[in-house]
Amino acid sequence: MSGRRVLALYGALLLGFAAVVCRLYWLCSNTEYAVRAAAQSEAVLRLPAARGNFYDCGGLPLTGLSQSWLALCFPGEGSYTRLYPYADADGQARLYRERNTSRPFLLDVVQDVSGLGVRCYAVPRRYAAAPLAEQLIGYLDSEGHGAAGLEAALDDVLYTGERDTLHCAVTAQGRLQRGSEPILEKADSAPQGVRLTLSRSIQRAAEGVAAESMATGCILIIDVSSGKVRACVSLPGFDAANVGESLTAPGSPLLNRAFSAYAVGSVFKPVLAAAALEAGEGDFIRECPGYDALNGQVYRCAGSVPHGLVGLDGALEKSCNGYFIELGRNLGPERVRKMAAALGFGKGQDIADGLRSASGVLPEAETLENEGQFANFCFGQGELLATPLQVAGMMNTIAAGGVYHTPLFVECTVDETTGEELTPLAHSSSRRVFAEQTAEKLQELLAGVVAEGTGQQAAP
């Protein structure tokens, strides 16, 4: 080979080598490639989305009362054998699916397993094992959004979408890089909580009484002076952490019976008593033969038992249907219906934005022009339907001296860090329905029902 060719080859090799060196220098000094390389070796795991809690009227939490645990699992750590006993059925199935994975993952475990050498993170457990006011509060869907009850109605307030994240430097096999530790990055903002009118202690006590005394039903406890609901219980209950099991369960446990409409019956009779006292008909007396006949239709008292000569007090104590039918005829349909409407019958109650109780059925004036329909209406039968919330509002009006206070369940949003009140979510509303003297007489009459009449089982 001639010297000129050797020189040309040598020059070409030198030029190529120089190009490679320049390229390597450029790559080393380019931070964008470094960032990409680091990102390819980082695993980011998202913890459950942050969500504001519900609090009672004194600031005590109603949700988030306990915590659950997430175990951080890396390939090659023996997670399957170590964590299997500490996972529920779904977690055990996931361990099996992920046994040959090449990426880290978070696993729900029943307790803190850091003693096994596994990194473990505490997260709030939304609902307690014995949940509070579950039908009122509701439950979440699989994405952490409210699906029912106040959880759904106030989802825009409670859900932020912000999540804490775990950043793990991993190898190509998904294992934690030697000398590194996972970094927990907190969400930028904390969610707002919501303060309810409920009292946690009263709610818990009411749920205990309900569990001992009924399989199906509800309990409402209202602050007489304000209309604020201190307890709202509906049975049967359900597990808000496992709603699927309750979808087909007997007794419709997802139904909030306090907000659902039912046939009313004799608890409607105080409405007629109030109308009678306001109209000056409180001294009406009737001889009860155990029934009342109207246009060939017989309306019987319970067991067709004659009550004899009864006034308003005896008719309430004995729950005399015939007395109230005749009292209603004396008053007229318009007066009785007007009193019922003023006490909240036939109108739904806004619990929160997007959550409303049933309106029930208050028969139209034209319907009550029919004597048979009006007779049934006078002792709480016929087309009349009402919610326990409406009945509780009526009874509270009697206790509050004739003033109707709209029942309230929600108070305001709160700062979860300081407890400071932020934005009011409801406003109280009151109106006088009947005179204070009427309310005092009704209180006396209803006390007699408990002491001497059909309500003796309600005596303290």
Which sequence ranges carry the predicted segments?
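Beta-lactam-recognizing serine transpeptidase/beta-lactamase-like catalytic domain environment
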Residues: 61-63, 181, 223-266, 271-460
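Periplasmic/cell-envelope proteins involved in peptidoglycan metabolism and beta-lactam response
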Residues: 1-244, 337-342, 458-459
